């Protein structure tokens, strides 16, 4: 018995075992979550069994390996308690599962989570794309009233055209975040081409815009990086670095308020939607009637504290249009109406904490802004098959914005003649290794 206790203690003290447990549950759940967005046949019973298995594995990881401070423990307990009340009040299990996935990612490398997410999405979506073109699974084609006669919107193996486009957007977003330092001009041109193809074949306007903005944001960031590295003369570097830090702060603030901003805009546009208002009606038509449907939801169901059961029937899985179609696409209004104002507040606070925790990671801030824009119209904010950014709350996510030797902190140093120069920390240490502690001091944080 003592031997088993020692083995157990030894096993639970190894953090790698906890990481392995997380990825076991993560992969099982993600596989079936992504599969459900495709036209591949899948069994509901098998999905439920895998769901239960992944919940057990992730809960085991939390109980055996995770250690919290008192404040974080209270916060985590509050998140679980709120999601459990939402489950009882509305009957929806997904908020509880979302919280479980986030909490179980504690101390797991964020980069590794994104890599596995990206690999699984590329593999499954790639197979679905090829299978749909070969006729193995159905390639759903829809005729849109906005398109010319004879023009079709294709789903390429997904349950709907916008789902395919959303997968492409989130895969590109993840890949750009992971491999930001390897991006070149042809990647940005390729992103614009993909944006055009998504518009032409899927007519997914939101994801077309988001993919284009993705290339634009990262290209601009790349230019700023290149500019800051181009010269190391003090009179130029100092000014450029200050400008770079100013933009960095702007991204940080915008990311922090982006979800509150876009959520508020969508709520009031929906609340005050009237057909007679030409401006709002134009917006409604541009986003295919989403304001009208959201207003119906607000007036019919209202906003509750802990959520309510709201039947929704959307497009997808078939080319037949349901007669009782009703679906709220905006993530903000979807969460607010279905899961309640308290859980909606928790989601907003979580992303605010992610922004604060990773405020040195400008690329993550840009990614969250793009996510906030996308979720204004799409409902994928809490959908793990699409959005992987929420894991940054508890996962190990250090700043990836700057590589070695490209820090924004400047140092001033004096040589033997009394002249001073400004340079990056690494450059100063390499130039004056014997005097770096004595003669170097930071002049710009």
Please give the residue ranges for each predicted region:
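Hydrophobic transmembrane alpha-helices and their immediate junctions
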Residues: 338-372, 404
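Long extracytoplasmic/lumenal interhelical loops at the membrane interface
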Residues: 279-339
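Transmembrane alpha-helices of multi-pass inner-membrane enzymes
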Residues: 368-372, 382-420, 445
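Hydrophobic alpha-helical segments of polytopic membrane proteins
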Residues: 70-81, 177-268, 356-357
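Membrane-interface segments at transmembrane-helix junctions in multi-pass inner-membrane proteins
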Residues: 134-180, 205-206, 331-335
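Interfacial loop-to-transmembrane-helix boundary motif in multi-pass membrane proteins
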Residues: 104-128
């Amino acid at each position: 018995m003592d031997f088993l206790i020692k083995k157990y203690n030894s096993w639970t003290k190894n953090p790698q075992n906890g990481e392995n447990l997380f990825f076991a549950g993560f992969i099982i759940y993600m596989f079936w979550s992504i599969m459900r967005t495709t036209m591949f046949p899948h069994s509901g019973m098998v999905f439920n069994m895998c769901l239960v298995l992944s919940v057990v594995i992730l809960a085991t990881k939390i109980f055996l390996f995770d250690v919290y401070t008192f404040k974080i423990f209270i916060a985590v307990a509050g998140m679980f308690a709120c999601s459990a009340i939402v489950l009882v009040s509305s009957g929806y299990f997904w908020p509880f599962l979302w919280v479980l996935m986030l909490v179980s990612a504690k101390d797991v490398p964020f980069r590794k989570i994104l890599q596995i997410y990206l690999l699984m999405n590329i593999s499954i979506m790639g197979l679905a794309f090829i299978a749909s073109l070969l006729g193995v699974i159905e390639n759903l084609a829809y005729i849109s009233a906005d398109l010319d006669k004879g023009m079709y919107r294709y789903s390429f193996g997904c349950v709907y055209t916008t789902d395919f486009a959303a997968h492409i957007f989130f895969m590109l977003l993840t890949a750009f975040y992971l491999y930001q330092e390897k991006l070149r001009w042809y990647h940005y041109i390729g992103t614009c081409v993909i944006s055009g193809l998504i518009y032409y074949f899927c007519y997914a306007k939101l994801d077309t815009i988001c993919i284009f903005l993705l290339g634009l944001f990262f290209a601009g960031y790349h230019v700023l990086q290149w500019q800051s590295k181009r010269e190391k003369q003090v009179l130029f570097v100092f000014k450029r670095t200050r400008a770079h830090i100013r933009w960095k702060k702007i991204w940080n603030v915008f990311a922090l308020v982006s979800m509150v901003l876009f959520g508020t805009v969508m709520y009031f546009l929906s609340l005050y939607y009237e057909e007679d208002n030409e401006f709002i009606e134009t917006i409604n038509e541009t986003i295919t009637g989403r304001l009208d449907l959201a207003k119906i939801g607000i007036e019919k169901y209202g906003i509750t504290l802990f959520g309510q059961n709201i039947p929704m029937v959307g497009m997808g899985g078939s080319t037949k249009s349901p007669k009782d179609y009703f679906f709220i696409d905006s993530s903000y209004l979807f969460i607010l109406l279905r899961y309640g104002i308290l859980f909606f507040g928790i989601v907003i606070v979580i992303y605010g904490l992610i922004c604060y925790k990773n405020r040195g990671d400008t690329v993550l801030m840009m990614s969250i802004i793009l996510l906030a824009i996308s979720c204004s119209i799409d409902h994928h904010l809490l959908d793990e098959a699409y959005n992987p950014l929420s894991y940054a709350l508890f996962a190990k996510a250090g700043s990836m914005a700057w590589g070695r030797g490209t820090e924004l902190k400047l140092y001033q140093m004096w040589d033997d003649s009394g002249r001073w120069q400004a340079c990056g920390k690494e450059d100063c240490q390499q130039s004056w290794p014997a005097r770096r502690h004595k003669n170097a001091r930071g002049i710009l944080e």
